Swiss-Prot record:
Protein name as annotated: Snake venom serine protease jerdonase
Any one Gene Ontology molecular-function term assigned to this protein's record: serine-type peptidase activity
A cellular component annotation (GO) from this entry: extracellular region
GO BP terms, alphabetized: proteolysis
Organism of origin: Protobothrops jerdonii
Family in the record: Belongs to the peptidase S1 family. Snake venom subfamily.
UniProt subcellular location: Secreted
UniProt function note: Multifunctional venom serine protease that has fibrino(geno)lytic activity towards the A alpha-chain of human fibrinogen (FGA) and a slow activity towards the B beta-chain (FGB). Also hydrolyzes bovine low-molecular-mass kininogen and releases bradykinin.
Lineage, top ranks: Eukaryota, Metazoa, Chordata, Craniata, Vertebrata
Amino acid sequence: IIGGDECNINEHPFLVALYDA
């Protein structure tokens, strides 16, 4: 995930959660 959770949360909410955790 490149660009931050705000950029990809729409496409990868589950991955964003793991990366942001």
